[in-house]
UniProtKB/Swiss-Prot annotation:
GO BP terms: negative regulation of cell killing; response to toxic substance
Short name of one Pfam family: Epsilon_antitox
The organism of origin for this protein: Enterococcus faecalis
Signal sequence bounds: none
GO MF term list: toxic substance binding
Keyword field contains Ligase: no
InterPro entries associated with the record: Antitoxin_epsilon/PezA_dom_sf (IPR035569), Epsilon_PezA_dom (IPR015090)
Name of the protein described by the UniProt record: Antitoxin epsilon 2
Family stated for the protein in its record: Belongs to the epsilon antitoxin family.
Source organism, top-level taxon: Bacteria
Length: 90
């Protein structure tokens, strides 16, 4: 599978966005001293899901799949901001 400039650029954007989203949720979990083994907590489940999603080998994906993965991380970015903000207000 050939690696093009566009594909490499897309992968770099996904890597930056996924790290940002994952770190936001991880910081929330750590700052609130949540039990990372307690799968009843939404934030812990989200953290686990994001960790698994980060393990995908992006260089093995076709460009079209990278676009879908990018959209997934955009959605998780919005979602994590929403739920973590609501938790702070409550």
């Amino acid at each position: 599978m050939a690696v093009t400039y566009e594909k490499t650029f897309e992968i770099e954007i996904i890597n930056e966005l996924s790290a940002s989203v994952y770190n936001r949720v991880l910081n929330y979990v750590l700052n609130h001293e949540l039990d990372t083994k307690n799968t009843r907590l939404l934030e812990v489940n989200l953290l686990n899901q994001l960790e698994v999603a980060q393990e995908v080998d992006l260089f093995q994906q076709p460009f079209e799949e990278l676009q879908a993965i990018h959209e997934y991380w955009r959605s998780m970015n919005q979602y994590s901001k929403q739920i973590l903000t609501k938790e702070k207000v409550a």
